[in-house]
């Protein structure tokens, strides 16, 4: 066989009409070689191969084509079975153009699903098998059964319940949405256009915004009966309403004005277009989308119960000797030979150190340093908590200077962290680990606190075993039989014997003062002792202070742990806010976690969706694969497809991170097994994203040597290929699964001028009528996680304001990371940047920033006549909302290119690269000189172009103050959500200082009156100092003339 030519990924993205010569190896040993279209799918290629093979020797020895499957070597140098024969060759992207045909083995349906899951989650399922890890295998079996049972239950749902699963309602946050200054009026007449499924005839008639969908459908049926002169026999209860051109339905006992789609139509002055869909169509959809029957075998019988622990096991609590380990040696250690190597070890329960850390002796640097040293900890084995983790840090120290003046502090500064690793002391079945363990370590990242140990890091070994530094340790055999942590009944038995204490009135007052103290700073030792002593009082009178009590519990004393867990059994259920706090890393105990999840079960789907990002991040804190949070998220995702969609993408976007790839991959596998139809929808999105990445790489390369117009032409040429058009058309938007990305409008697609050349992709959808234009921005090379978090918080603020009847016309556009520095951003149509508006109304970039009339004139041109008053009101409300939001979140780097205005008048901010007060500096000087952006041209619009329209301005100030006051009332919610997001590892959200910014901006240590006074000072400062913003904008305009 001639030597093959390797095919890098770029090779497969060339024009489709080019064919590629492929080498084929048949099971009979026959070799064939002929050209095929890179655009052909594997099924077509197999037919071509069969046609040619019949003229070759030994053809009679072959079975039918369906008995064989192609294999290839993929781009990661692995052999891959290509079970899905609808995939195109250019999408398979084999490393060499060589396809080998092998006999199929095993269950084809099962293998096809496994192959599709592997492709979708970005990790081969065979990698999970090859780990031979009992915890992984048990988790997979348990979750597979859990998810398949959920799928079977879903298949039995009635049409209305199935509709709720597949197309959850999209409602405004509350019925009281008629906020001050908004233009919606209660009980307003509304014209709607309704057609019946399968018919092109449509009817337009008037209903009230207070009517429920059932009333609208009854009107439509009466109208149809009148027009066609037929008797009225059909019942409205047998129908539901679909929004035309969208995967969105209106149903339930909600007034029409509470549906987001109807609200958007009211605001934009458009007529809602709806389709009446019969229940039989919904049931047909359900049956078509049901999971295939369990593969061949009968419904799985429940596994036999785990045998009870044999009497030959030993209870941990019976072992009173100190805990010790042996440090044997290291390997693959890379450090300066002039230094010495040291290992530090510590025992942690969450953030709490259980005893003093211990350090090894110093040894000379070499690749395989040897210690053979016993490390003893100041804690008895019986006092080790169930979730204790052993943390190691390997670091180098410069040999101590010979000068007598050298101080300990100086020598500590010379510590050079190399790597860290963590290990749970108990396995997932509660057994104390023993024997030799090789810990593959993670490279250390310098920490501003100078901490060497990393207790919040993963307990998984670094999978990069070829190059990672490693430590070989030995956990001693402490008893003749396996040692187990006591079962819950034994713990409760010990905890029951807690003595009752007499509480004085003075102690009760002290307790109240400690627990009601603003801010949750560190308590003094005597305060901790008092809270613990009065724990029954805390349970009875301050149950929401459970977190405080858990933090003062001595987790290195098994009697106290037993008493705390006994108390937890009868603790009243917590409100959601307090339960969220318990998911933080500071509370690792599994019983505490289960209690928190029990309290979170009351979350509505909309509330869960609002906090989903944080809940996914705190999965990183979990010590074992099987935990209540994972089951809770899977359970809810399999009962609501929108939650399933976003759970999938939040997990999938981090599959490139080695420390979470195993956990996230296993959860993704379980979700896919519980929703095989949704898996196909997600695969379509994955294919589109793959094509967009290839397109973006091509554009980046081309734009280096070719002017933009020619590069744009080449981009369009590439997009017109059949493989691209097919992949990029007719898919649900990853940003919002109810949005259908129908036909890609190649001529309207372009790329932006910024460094990473983001793609601007436009879609049209005829069915959706005038609202059918949709745009997405594909970014490749930028981390969108901080933008997503900021937009999530702005959306949460919008919800909280609307619940109080204040609609500030915010625009929290969609933003979703989908992979390693890749993601999508929603295009807000009919909008422009302030920079462009100012530059287009000025002759010079230098004077543009000082043109106070530019914004108002632009709004006048877009909103003639009476529409201008409405546009100015929209501007006023949204400007108030973003002033408060950007101040509270400390959003920096604000200039005229990242503040935009919609033609309707709504102002909004984009690009959130800096937040929580991490402002840009230049030459050490802070460039952000104002609390938020409130320039004179904004005030000019708010005052309708009049210089002394103080009434309008005071109304604007009132909106700001009311918005700020509402956010303060929910201050703890923001603190908890940001605290949970520390698990994400964002550079600007890594320590308590970043959270402190929020406490300060919301003035959480002050009374409401003091806080409002504080905000007024900031408001006046923003107004007074707005000339500085103008100077910044002038500099920005001059350095980057934005005129297109």
UniProtKB/Swiss-Prot annotation:
It is found in: Cytoplasm. It is an enzyme of class 2 (transferase). Residues 16-105 form the PI3K-ABD domain. GO terms for cellular component: cytoplasm; cytosol; phosphatidylinositol 3-kinase complex; phosphatidylinositol 3-kinase complex, class IA; plasma membrane. Pathway: Phospholipid metabolism; phosphatidylinositol phosphate biosynthesis. Activated by growth factors and cytokine receptors through a tyrosine-kinase-dependent mechanism. Activated by RAS. IC87114 inhibits lipid kinase activity and is selective in cells at doses up to 5-10 uM. IC87114 blocks T-cell receptor signaling in naive and memory T-cells and reduces cytokine production by memory T-cells. InterPro entries: ARM-type_fold, C2_domain_sf, Kinase-like_dom_sf, PI3/4_kinase_cat_dom, PI3/4_kinase_cat_sf, PI3/4_kinase_CS, PI3K-type_C2_dom, PI3K_ABD. In humans, the highest levels of expression are seen in peripheral blood mononuclear cells, spleen, and thymus, and low levels of expression in testes, uterus, colon, and small intestine but not in other tissues examined including prostate, heart, brain, and liver. Isoform 2 is expressed in normal thymus, lung and spleen tissues, and is detected at low levels in normal lysates from colon and ovarian biopsies, at elevated levels in lysates from colorectal tumors and is abundantly expressed in some ovarian tumors (at protein level). Both isoform 1 and isoform 2 are widely expressed. Residues 319-476 form the C2 PI3K-type domain. Residues 287-312 are annotated as: Disordered. The modification Phosphoserine is found at residue 1039. Changing residue 1021 to K: In IMD14A; results in gain of function causing enhanced membrane association and kinase activity. Residues 187-278 form the PI3K-RBD domain. Its EC number is 2.7.1.137, 2.7.1.153. Autophosphorylation on Ser-1039 results in the almost complete inactivation of the lipid kinase activity. Phosphoinositide-3-kinase (PI3K) phosphorylates phosphatidylinositol (PI) and its phosphorylated derivatives at position 3 of the inositol ring to produce 3-phosphoinositides. Uses ATP and PtdIns(4,5)P2 (phosphatidylinositol 4,5-bisphosphate) to generate phosphatidylinositol 3,4,5-trisphosphate (PIP3). PIP3 plays a key role by recruiting PH domain-containing proteins to the membrane, including AKT1 and PDPK1, activating signaling cascades involved in cell growth, survival, proliferation, motility and morphology. Mediates immune responses. Belongs to the PI3/PI4-kinase family. IC87114 inhibitor reduces passive cutaneous anaphylaxis, attenuates allergic airway inflammation and hyperresponsiveness and allergen induced rhinitis response. Inhibitors may have therapeutic potential for the treatment of immune system-mediated diseases such as auto-immune diseases, inflammation and allergy. This is Phosphatidylinositol 4,5-bisphosphate 3-kinase catalytic subunit delta isoform. It comes from Homo sapiens.
């Amino acid at each position: 066989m001639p030597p093959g030519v390797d095919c890098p990924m770029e090779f497969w993205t060339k024009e489709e009409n080019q064919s590629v010569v492929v080498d084929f190896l048949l099971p009979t040993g026959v070799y064939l070689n002929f050209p095929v279209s890179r655009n052909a799918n594997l099924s077509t290629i197999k037919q071509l191969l069969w046609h040619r093979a019949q003229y070759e020797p030994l053809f009679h020895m072959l079975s039918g084509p369906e008995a064989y499957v192609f294999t290839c070597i993929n781009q990661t140098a692995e052999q891959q079975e290509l079970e899905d024969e609808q995939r195109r060759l250019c999408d398979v992207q084999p490393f060499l153009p060589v396809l080998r045909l092998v006999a199929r083995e095993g269950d084809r349906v099962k293998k096809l699903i496994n192959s599709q899951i592997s492709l979708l989650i970005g990790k081969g399922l065979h990698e999970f098998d090859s780990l031979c890890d009992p915890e992984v295998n048990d988790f997979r079996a348990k979750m597979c059964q859990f998810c398949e049972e959920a799928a079977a239950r879903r298949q039995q749902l009635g049409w209305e319940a199935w509709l709720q699963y597949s197309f959850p309602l999209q409602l405004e946050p509350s019925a009281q949405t008629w906020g001050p200054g908004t233009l919606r009026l209660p009980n307003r007449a509304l014209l709607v256009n309704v057609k019946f499924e399968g018919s092109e005839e449509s009817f337009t008639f008037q209903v009230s915004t207070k009517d429920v969908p059932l009333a609208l459908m009854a009107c439509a049926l009466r109208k149809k009966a009148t027009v066609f002169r037929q008797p009225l026999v059909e019942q409205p209860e047998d129908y539901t309403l679909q929004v035309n051109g969208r995967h969105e339905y209106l149903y339930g006992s909600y007034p029409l004005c509470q549906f987001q789609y109807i609200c958007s139509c009211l605001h934009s002055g458009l007529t809602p277009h709806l389709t009446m869909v019969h229940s039989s169509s919904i049931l047909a959809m359900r049956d078509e989308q049901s999971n295939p029957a369990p593969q061949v075998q009968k419904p799985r019988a429940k596994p036999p119960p785990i045998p009870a622990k044999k009497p030959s096991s030993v209870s941990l609590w019976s072992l009173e000797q100190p805990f010790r380990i042996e440090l044997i040696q290291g390997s693959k250690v890379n450090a300066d030979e002039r230094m010495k190597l040291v290992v530090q070890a510590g025992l942690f329960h969450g953030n709490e150190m259980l005893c003093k850390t211990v350090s090894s002796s110093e040894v000379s640097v070499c690749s395989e340093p040897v210690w053979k040293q016993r490390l003893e900890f100041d804690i008895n084995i019986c006092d080790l908590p169930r979730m204790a983790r052993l943390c190691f840090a390997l670091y180098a120290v410069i040999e101590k200077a010979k000068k007598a003046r050298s101080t300990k502090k100086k020598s500590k500064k010379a510590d050079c962290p190399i790597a860290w690793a963590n290990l749970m002391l108990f396995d997932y079945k509660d057994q104390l680990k023993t024997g030799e363990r090789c810990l593959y370590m993670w490279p250390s990242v310098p920490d501003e606190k100078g901490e060497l140990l990393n207790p919040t890091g993963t307990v998984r070994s670094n999978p990069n075993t070829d190059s990672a530094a490693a430590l070989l340790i030995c956990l001693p055999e402490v008893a003749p039989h396996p040692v187990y942590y006591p079962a819950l009944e034994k713990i409760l038995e010990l905890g029951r014997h807690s003595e009752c204490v007499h509480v004085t009135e003075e102690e009760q007052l002290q307790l109240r003062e400690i627990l009601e103290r603003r801010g949750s700073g560190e308590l003094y030792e005597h305060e901790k002792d008092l809270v613990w002593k009065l724990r029954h009082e805390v349970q009875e009178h301050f149950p929401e202070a459970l977190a405080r009590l858990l933090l003062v519990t001595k987790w290195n004393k098994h009697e106290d742990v037993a008493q705390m867990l006994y108390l937890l059994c009868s603790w009243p259920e917590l409100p959601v806010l307090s339960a969220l706090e318990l998911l933080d890393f500071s509370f690792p105990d599994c019983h505490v976690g289960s209690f928190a999840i029990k309290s979170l079960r009351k979350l509505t789907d909309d509330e869960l969706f609002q906090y989903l990002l944080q809940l996914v991040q705190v999965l990183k804190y979990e010590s074992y694969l099987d935990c209540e949070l994972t089951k809770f998220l899977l359970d809810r995702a399999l009962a609501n497809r929108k939650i399933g969609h976003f759970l999938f993408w939040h997990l999938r976007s981090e599959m490139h991170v080695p420390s979470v790839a195993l956990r996230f991959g296993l959860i993704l596998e379980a979700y896919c097994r519980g929703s095989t139809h949704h898996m196909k929808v997600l695969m379509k999105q994955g294919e589109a994203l793959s094509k967009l990445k290839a397109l973006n790489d091509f554009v980046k390369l081309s734009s280096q040597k070719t002017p933009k117009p020619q590069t744009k032409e080449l981009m369009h040429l590439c997009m017109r290929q059949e493989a691209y058009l097919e992949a990029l058309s007719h898919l649900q938007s990853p940003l919002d699964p109810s949005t259908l990305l129908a036909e890609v409008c190649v001529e309207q697609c372009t790329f932006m001028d910024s460094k990473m050349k983001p793609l601007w992709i436009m879609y049209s959808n005829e069915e959706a009528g005038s609202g059918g234009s949709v745009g997405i921005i594909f970014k490749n090379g930028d981390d969108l996680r901080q933008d997503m978090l900021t937009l999530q918080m702005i959306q949460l603020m919008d919800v909280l304001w609307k619940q109080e009847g204040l609609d500030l016309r915010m625009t929290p556009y969609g933003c979703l990371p989908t992979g390693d520095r890749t993601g999508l951003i929603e295009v807000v149509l009919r909008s422009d940047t302030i920079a462009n508006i100012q530059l287009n109304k000025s002759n010079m970039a230098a004077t543009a920033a000082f043109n106070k009339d530019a914004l108002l004139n632009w709004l006048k041109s877009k909103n003639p006549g009476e529409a201008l008053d409405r546009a100015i009101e929209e501007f006023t409300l949204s400007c108030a909302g973003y002033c408060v939001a950007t101040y509270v979140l400390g959003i920096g780097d604000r200039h005229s290119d990242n503040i935009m205005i919609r033609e309707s008048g709504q102002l909004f901010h984009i690009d959130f690269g800096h937040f929580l007060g991490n402002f840009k500096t230049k030459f050490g000087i802070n460039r952000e000189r104002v609390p938020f952006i409130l320039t004179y041209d904004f005030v000019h619009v708010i005052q309708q172009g009049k210089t002394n329209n103080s009434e309008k301005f005071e109304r604007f100030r009132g909106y700001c103050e009311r918005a700020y006051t509402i956010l303060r009332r929910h201050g703890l919610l923001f603190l908890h959500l940001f605290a949970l997001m520390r698990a994400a590892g964002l550079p600007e959200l890594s320590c308590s200082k970043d959270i402190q910014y929020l406490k300060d901006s919301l003035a959480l240590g002050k009374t409401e009156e003091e806080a409002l006074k504080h905000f007024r000072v900031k408001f006046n400062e923003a107004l007074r100092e707005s000339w500085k913003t103008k100077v910044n904008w002038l500099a920005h305009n001059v350095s980057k003339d934005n005129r297109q």
